């Protein structure tokens, strides 16, 4: 499927200061001359800041990484996780429509999107808050049907729960990601039948949802100040340099 940039583009893009610091930190993960390896995380952060990727954002990332603009454009147009047109300012719902989710009710979730958001995918709701699209498998087949918002999964949905989810976002709340039917992760609905000792050390939510809660790393991120700048690899780099033999 051919993907192009949206015809209406802003004049400029600038990373917010905290996001710029985060981006510069990501670049240090890679050896000199390999900065292009940071292209996906930088594009993702630009999208988290703006909601979608604009041409000026691609140009900014290309300049930061010393890449030709066309190379960054190739990445952005190849991966469907990158939005190339405006989306709802609160949430863009990606509804998985592949086999497991389809069998378990994805079409019903799409009907909810058409009723409560917009009749066509990628159209923005009248209040400007939401948009939606159907996507291919998101790898949460054991928790079908589900939707993705940014990097958060909302799983084990019914039409009622999904409708309530949209209402929660509309009211300014951010529902906790993960299973929405009371399941911890992807265990059988009746509960674990083996490896039960694991539950003794379990966190309140499963690992991905717990991380989102602990770091306040949710769909509400805008400028990067909402979460701490974590760069554990820098201390390892400094330690390894100290261990190098002197010449």
Give, region by region, the residue ranges found by the protein language model:
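Signature of N-terminal electron-transfer/Fe-S-associated modules in redox systems
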Residues: 1-247
């Amino acid at each position: 499927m051919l993907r192009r940039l949206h015809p209406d583009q802003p004049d400029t893009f600038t990373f917010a200061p905290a996001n710029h610091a985060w981006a510069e930190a990501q670049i240090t993960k890679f050896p000199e001359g390999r900065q292009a390896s940071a292209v996906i995380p930088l594009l993702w952060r630009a999208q988290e800041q703006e909601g979608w990727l604009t041409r000026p954002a691609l140009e900014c990332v290309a300049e930061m990484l010393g890449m030709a603009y066309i190379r960054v454009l190739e990445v952005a147009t190849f991966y469907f996780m990158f939005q190339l047109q405006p989306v709802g300012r609160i949430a863009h719902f990606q509804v998985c429509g592949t086999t497991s989710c389809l069998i378990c009710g994805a079409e019903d979730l799409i009907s909810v999107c058409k009723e409560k958001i917009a009749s066509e995918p990628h159209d923005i709701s009248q209040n400007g808050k939401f948009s939606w699209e159907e996507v291919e498998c998101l790898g949460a087949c054991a928790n079908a049907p589900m939707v993705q918002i940014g990097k958060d999964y909302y799983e084990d949905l019914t039409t009622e729960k999904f409708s309530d989810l949209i209402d929660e976002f509309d009211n300014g709340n951010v529902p906790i990601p993960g299973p929405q039917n009371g399941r911890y992760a992807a265990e059988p609905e009746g509960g674990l039948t083996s490896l039960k000792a694991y539950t003794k050390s379990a966190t309140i939510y499963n690992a991905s949802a717990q991380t989102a809660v602990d770091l306040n790393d949710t769909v509400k991120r805008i400028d990067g100040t909402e979460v701490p700048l974590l760069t554990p690899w820098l201390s390892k780099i400094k330690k390894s340099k100290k261990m190098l033999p002197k010449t």
